[in-house]
C-alpha cells in the first residue's frame, strides 16, 4: 500500500463583530488565519492573490455582516502613468533619499510614527502604541518584509513605508510621515516610489489593500490607474465609478 504524507490542515477563524473603523454605523468582522511554519510564504502568496492582507503573522479578509464595501485593489505597475499632480509630487520630493532596510524597528522610526499618529489619528488605537507594539508590527513577519526610509539631505527621517515582497509584486503594509511636511503629499510619494521599485524589480503589481468608496481615508486609491480589483471573477480592471 502506498503512503502519502498528509499536509498539515490550516485553520481559519472569524472574529467577533466590532464597530467598523471606516463606515459609521456598520459592523466589522474578519476571517483570519495564522501565517506560520515552512509554508508561510506560499500561503501568504496564495491568500494575497485571493484578496487577503497581512498584519503581523496574521492574514485576514473582511467578512462583514450585510456589507461588502471593502474591495482589494492593486496597481498594474508596468502600465501605470502618473497624472499631472503625481508628477509634481514626485519632483517636489526629489531631494529625499530612499533606503530599503531590514524590518527592524528603530527609535528614529518610532518617534516619527508616534508623531504621525498623534497628528493624524489621535483617537485611534494605533495612537496608543508604545515602542514594543511598534516593534511587533514591524518585526513579527514570517515573510519577506522590509522598510523603506526616506531621509532629507541632513539625514532626518521624513517618511517610512513597511512593505512585503511577493513573487508578483510589492504590498504596502503601512506608511507614515512627518506631519510638519503634510504639504509634500508624502503618502502619495511613497506609493509612487513602490510602483517604480516594482518596475525595477520586474514585479507586475503593487498591492494597496482595500478600497472603500464610502471612506475618504480609503477611496483615494482609484487615483492610481490602471487599478485592478478582486471580486467573484478574480482580478479585473477597476476605474472610478466601477461599483462605487
Curated annotation (Swiss-Prot):
Q: Which SUPFAM superfamilies match?
A: Acyl-CoA N-acyltransferases (Nat)
Species for this entry: Paramagnetospirillum magneticum (strain ATCC 700264 / AMB-1) (Magnetospirillum magneticum)
Give the main location. Answer: cytoplasm
Catalytic activity as recorded in UniProt: N-terminal L-glutamyl-[protein] + L-leucyl-tRNA(Leu) = N-terminal L-leucyl-L-glutamyl-[protein] + tRNA(Leu) + H(+); N-terminal L-aspartyl-[protein] + L-leucyl-tRNA(Leu) = N-terminal L-leucyl-L-aspartyl-[protein] + tRNA(Leu) + H(+)
| Compartments where found | Cytoplasm
GO BP: any one term: ubiquitin-dependent protein catabolic process via the N-end rule pathway
> Could you tell me the gene encoding this protein?
bpt
Any single GO CC term annotated in Swiss-Prot or TrEMBL for this entry: cytoplasm
Could you tell me what this protein is called? Aspartate/glutamate leucyltransferase
Q: What is its EC number?
A: 2.3.2.29
Keywords for the protein's UniProt record, in alphabetical order: Acyltransferase, Cytoplasm, Transferase
Question: What's the family?
Answer: Belongs to the R-transferase family. Bpt subfamily.
Q: Which PANTHER family match?
A: ARGININE-TRNA-PROTEIN TRANSFERASE 1, ARGINYL-TRNA--PROTEIN TRANSFERASE 1
Q: Which HAMAP family match?
A: Bpt (MF_00689)
Cite the GO molecular-function annotations of the record. Answer: arginyl-tRNA--protein transferase activity; leucyl-tRNA--protein transferase activity
Q: Name one Pfam family in it.
A: ATE_C
- Tell me, what does this protein do in biology? Functions in the N-end rule pathway of protein degradation where it conjugates Leu from its aminoacyl-tRNA to the N-termini of proteins containing an N-terminal aspartate or glutamate.
Amino acid at each position: 500500500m502506498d503512503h502519502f504524507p498528509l499536509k498539515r490542515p490550516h485553520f481559519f477563524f472569524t472574529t467577533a463583530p466590532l464597530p467598523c473603523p471606516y463606515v459609521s454605523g456598520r459592523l466589522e468582522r474578519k476571517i483570519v488565519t495564522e501565517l506560520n511554519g515552512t509554508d508561510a510564504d506560499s500561503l501568504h502568496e496564495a491568500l494575497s492573490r485571493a484578496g487577503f492582507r497581512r498584519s503581523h503573522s496574521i492574514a485576514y479578509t473582511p467578512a462583514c455582516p450585510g456589507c461588502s464595501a471593502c474591495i482589494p485593489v492593486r496597481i498594474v505597475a508596468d502600465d501605470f502613468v502618473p497624472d499631472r499632480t503625481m508628477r509634481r509630487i514626485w519632483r517636489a520630493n526629489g531631494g529625499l533619499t530612499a533606503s530599503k532596510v531590514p524590518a527592524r524597528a528603530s527609535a528614529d522610526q518610532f518617534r516619527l510614527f508616534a508623531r504621525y499618529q498623534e497628528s493624524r489619528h489621535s483617537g485611534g488605537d494605533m495612537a496608543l502604541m508604545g515602542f514594543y507594539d511598534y516593534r511587533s508590527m514591524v518585526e513579527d513577519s514570517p515573510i519577506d518584509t522590509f522598510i523603506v526610509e526616506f531621509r532629507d539631505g541632513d539625514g532626518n527621517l521624513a517618511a517610512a513605508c513597511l512593505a512585503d515582497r511577493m513573487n508578483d509584486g510589492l504590498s504596502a503594509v503601512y506608511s507614515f510621515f512627518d506631519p510638519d511636511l503634510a504639504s509634500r503629499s508624502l503618502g502619495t510619494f511613497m506609493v509612487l516610489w513602490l510602483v517604480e521599485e516594482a518596475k525595477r524589480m520586474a514585479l507586475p503589481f503593487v498591492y494597496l489593500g482595500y478600497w472603500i468608496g464610502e471612506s475618504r481615508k480609503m477611496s483615494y486609491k482609484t487615483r492610481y490607474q490602471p487599478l485592478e480589483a478582486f471580486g467573484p471573477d478574480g482580478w479585473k480592471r477597476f476605474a472610478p465609478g466601477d461599483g462605487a
